[in-house]
Regions:
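Conserved ABC ATPase "signature" region
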Residues: 33-50, 158-159
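Hydrophobic anchor residue at the start of the ABC signature
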Residues: 69
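A short, surface-exposed alpha-helical micro-motif characterized by mixed small hydrophobic
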Residues: 122-124
Length: 175
């Protein structure tokens, strides 16, 4: 599942066609079974059949990202790769998609490789974190209450996290 859901789908196809495409190529299902599976996957990502005949430009960013999740899950993968999959969403939608991913992990037993630069998302979703620098893994740790890194690359990520609330600075003004 990619960061840019708009580029990940053909804008001229309907959601029904988008969901059926991987099933046609990767599963031995009849058309009626594919359609039933498409409907089931939409329900799993909190969408209903009313979106089946819509095209991507008619959907919100959050809806389209959930369609992409449904498409990926339709073929029952053992591993789901999420490449910055919530980066283009606002914080409310990010939180909703993270909750949805946790639910889907439990429901389908699918492992997730969650690629992100946002450590707040790592803390909310992941059990283990690996830090990469120039294509090499430089640090691995279990995600606990507070992530602290020893590698330079890990500390750069850690220092890039914005505080939950703005920090007020005291200023002294001479009049």
């Amino acid at each position: 599942v990619f960061q840019d859901s708009i580029s990940a789908v053909n804008p001229r196809k309907t959601v029904r066609e988008i969901l059926r495409e991987p099933m046609r190529h990767l599963l031995s299902l009849k058309k009626s079974e594919q359609l039933a599976r498409a409907s089931e996957m939409l329900k799993a990502v909190d969408l209903d059949d009313s979106v089946l005949d819509k095209r991507p430009p008619q959907l919100s960013g959050g809806q389209l990202q959930r369609v992409c999740l449904a498409r990926a899950l339709a073929v029952e993968p053992k591993l789901l790769i999420l490449d910055e999959a919530v980066s283009n969403l606002d914080l409310v939608l990010q939180a909703g998609v993270i909750r949805l991913l946790k639910k889907l992990q439990q429901q389908f037993g699918t492992a997730c490789l969650f690629i992100t630069h946002d450590l707040r998302l790592v803390e909310r979703f992941c059990q283990r974190v690996m830090v990469m620098d120039n294509g090499q893994i430089v640090e691995t740790q279990v995600v606990g209450e507070k992530l602290t890194f020893s590698s330079d690359a890990g500390r750069v990520l850690q220092n890039a996290v914005l505080p939950a609330f703005p920090v007020r600075r005291r200023t002294t003004e001479k009049v």
